[in-house]
């Protein structure tokens, strides 16, 4: 479990690095992108094609990492994604958006 948590933390740092002209952190700070309850990021409000590409890139990286974690731990990828969603929401800075269990966007 400690290895899983360490890996999830590393993943969060990795996907926060710039993926295009707009970074994930910038998009989250501006309220354009938020942490979805699925363990992936999603567009909170109208996004540009650049933001849509950023979201797709980040989610592809997360999906790949979640799959590797799931395989190592012999669990389903949905379990990894759900646990990641909990961790990401807990670490989210004040003012950024997350999706609650009912799918509503909330500002922390």
Write out the residue ranges for each language-model feature.
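Classic N-terminal secretory signal peptides
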Residues: 1-20
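Short, well-ordered alpha-helical segments
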Residues: 55-70
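Basic side chains
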Residues: 2-3, 62, 83
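Amphipathic, charged alpha-helical segments and their helix-to-coil junctions
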Residues: 22-53, 73, 77-108
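Broad structural signal for hydrophobic residues in well-ordered alpha-helices, predominantly aliphatic
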Residues: 11-13, 69, 88
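A generic structural signal for short
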Residues: 12, 54-55
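Short linear sequence motifs
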Residues: 2, 59, 90-91
